[in-house]
């Protein structure tokens, strides 16, 4: 169990280092890749998740996936909270590492980039704030995400899961990510949001806990539960 918890922690941290890192790289003043845009960012998220899965193997790196696996009987319910806590902590630590790496660029951006934009480097935010619709978008995105991963995992070709999941993230990000930023993962959003709240970032906005708890905090669990029940009931996947 300890080994798996460490793997969940480290895998999530690495995912966040890639993900939050690419946002910092494309937004902060003075970076080599500033202005690279959303395709650059979404592609890095996809590749970064693939790399994390290649390195750490059979990890969830997502509390919503942990819930789905518990519902399917693949992970004991007693492990749901420990796995989820390890993943959120990984998100916090990964974000802190990125902040240290980009500290000079954060400092240079203080008077040029808005506090809201700085917050959005760490955590997701809606393009249009409408909490019921935002909730539905994250629920649906997560339903597609978890359903896709469960289907991909049925293919036994070595190496197909990390590659397939990376492509799935890329497709969801490009096609469905526009309204909310496709968190689909409490650890992906809450970990960096906590880091944003505690780090000594100059001129920062509040961390918008209302949105963080309601939308990326709760909706992915609902989407994952529906995905688990659908994939098991319709396709017989466990």
Swiss-Prot record:
Locus of motif NPA 2: 185-187
| Residue ranges crossing the lipid bilayer per the database entry | 2-22, 39-59, 80-100, 135-155, 158-178, 211-231
The record's Gene Ontology cellular component field reads: plasma membrane
The record's subcellular location field reads: Cell membrane
Q: How does it sit in the membrane?
A: Multi-pass membrane protein
- Give GO terms: molecular function aspect only: glycerol channel activity
The record, for InterPro entries, names:
Aquaporin-like, MIP, MIP/AQP_LacticAcid_Trans, MIP/Aquaporin
Q: Which UniProt keywords apply?
A: Cell membrane, Membrane, Transmembrane, Transmembrane helix, Transport
Q: What induces it?
A: Induced by L-lactate and repressed by D-lactate. Is thus regulated by the L-lactate/D-lactate ratio. Makes part of the lar operon (larABCDE).
Keyword check for Cell inner membrane, yes or no: no
Pfam families recorded: MIP (PF00230)
Instruction: Motif NPA 1 — list its residue ranges.
Output: 62-64
- Describe the outcome of a gene knockout: Cells lacking this gene show a decreased lactate transport ability. Deletion of this gene does not affect lactate racemase activity.
Function summary:
Transporter that facilitates the transmembrane diffusion of D/L-lactic acid. Is involved in the cellular racemization of lactate and lactate metabolism. The transported molecule is indeed lactic acid and not the lactate anion, in agreement with the assumption that, with very few exceptions, MIPs (major intrinsic proteins) only facilitate the transport of uncharged solutes. Also facilitates urea and H(2)O(2) diffusion across membranes, but is not permeable to water, glycerol and dihydroxyacetone.
User: NCBIfam families of this UniProt entry?
Assistant: LacAcidTportLarD
Family from the record? Belongs to the MIP/aquaporin (TC 1.A.8) family.
UniProt protein name: D/L-lactic acid transporter
Q: What is the scientific name of the source organism?
A: Lactiplantibacillus plantarum (strain ATCC BAA-793 / NCIMB 8826 / WCFS1)
């Amino acid at each position: 169990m300890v080994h798996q918890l460490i793997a969940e922690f480290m895998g999530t941290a690495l995912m966040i280092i890639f993900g939050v890192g690419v946002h910092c790289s494309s937004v902060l003043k003075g970076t080599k890749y500033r202005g690279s845009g959303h395709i650059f960012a979404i592609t890095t998220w996809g590749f970064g998740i693939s790399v994390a899965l290649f390195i750490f193997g059979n990890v969830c790196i997502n509390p919503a996936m942990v819930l789905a696996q518990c519902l399917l009987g693949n992970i004991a319910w007693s492990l749901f909270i420990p796995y989820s806590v390890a993943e959120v902590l990984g998100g916090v630590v990964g974000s802190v590492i990125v902040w240290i790496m980009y500290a000079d660029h954060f400092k240079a951006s203080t008077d040029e980039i808005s506090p809201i934009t700085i917050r959005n480097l760490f955590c997701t935010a809606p393009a249009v704030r409408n909490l019921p619709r935002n909730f539905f978008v994250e629920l649906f995105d997560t339903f597609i995400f978890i359903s896709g991963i469960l289907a991909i995992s049925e293919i036994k070709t070595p190496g197909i899961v990390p590659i397939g999941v990376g492509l799935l993230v890329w497709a969801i990000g490009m096609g469905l990510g526009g309204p909310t930023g496709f968190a689909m993962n409490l650890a992906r959003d809450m970990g960096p949001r906590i880091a944003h709240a505690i780090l000594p970032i100059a001129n920062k906005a509040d961390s918008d806990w209302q949105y963080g708890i309601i939308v990326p905090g709760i909706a992915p669990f609902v989407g994952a539960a529906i995905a688990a029940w659908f994939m098991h009931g319709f396709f017989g996947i466990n």
